[in-house]
Amino acid sequence: GMRVKILEGMALGRVVVTTSMGLEGIDAQHLKEVFLADTVESFVEAIALCRQDATFARKISEQARNFILRHY
C-alpha cells in the first residue's frame, strides 16, 4: 500500500529517514529526497548528518517537497 506518513512528511518539507521497505512504491532517491536507513547504525548516521549539516538537510527537505508537488 501507499506510505502516507512518508508522503505527508515529504509534503510538509520534513527530513524523512526511512527503510527500503518504507519507501517501496515511492520513487524518491536516497540522499536526494530522503535518507534510506536499513540498520540502526545508518539511522544514527542519517540523523547525525542532518544535525551536522543543516544546509544539506534543508536541501533534502526542499527536494522532498518538490518531489511531492511533481508526482502527487
Region annotations inferred by a language model:
Residues V4, D38-T39, Q52, Y72:
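Residue-level signal for the nucleotide or nucleotide-sugar donor/cofactor binding architecture
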Residues M2, T18-S20, A37-D38:
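Conserved acidic donor-binding loop of glycosyltransferase catalytic domains
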Residues G1-M2, G25:
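Short glycine-rich, flexible loops that bind phosphorylated cofactors or substrates
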Residues K5-E8, V15-T19:
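Short hydrophobic beta-strand element within catalytic cores of glycosyltransferases
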Residues M10-A11, A28-Q29, S61:
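A structural signal for short secondary-structure junctions
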Residues L49, F56-R70:
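A short, well-ordered alpha-helix in the C-terminal region of glycosyltransferases
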